[in-house]
């Protein structure tokens, strides 16, 4: 009769965690705000890789609006990373559930 093997479960969990970490490091998302006025690229560790700002937004001199657009684009990118993480973790947990 098959039994519960805690050591095997822990080993599989560690392997799945390492795979998840690698996937997240390789994940890159892009988000924008203001109809593309500001765009941000972010990796799975939530490090900003690049940011593009339409020069017209700078010329307008509306610093407060530009700050809001940068904040919105960064928050949108962060949300996309969170969603990718949840999806990846969901797959990892379903793989472990077969062992319980």
Name the predicted role of every residue range.
Residues 1-30, 79-100:
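Long amphipathic alpha-helical segments used for membrane anchoring, targeting, substrate engagement
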Residues 5, 62, 69:
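Short acidic-hydrophobic sequence patches enriched in Asp/Glu that either
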Residues 13, 46, 70:
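Residue-level signature of catalytic and energy-coupling elements of molecular machines
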Residues 28, 32-52:
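N-terminal intrinsically disordered, cationic/polar leader segments
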Residues 37-39, 58-60, 78:
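Short beta-strands and strand-coil junctions in structured, solvent-facing domains, enriched
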Residues 51-63:
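A short interface-forming secondary-structure element
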Residues 65-81:
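Short, well-ordered alpha-helical segments
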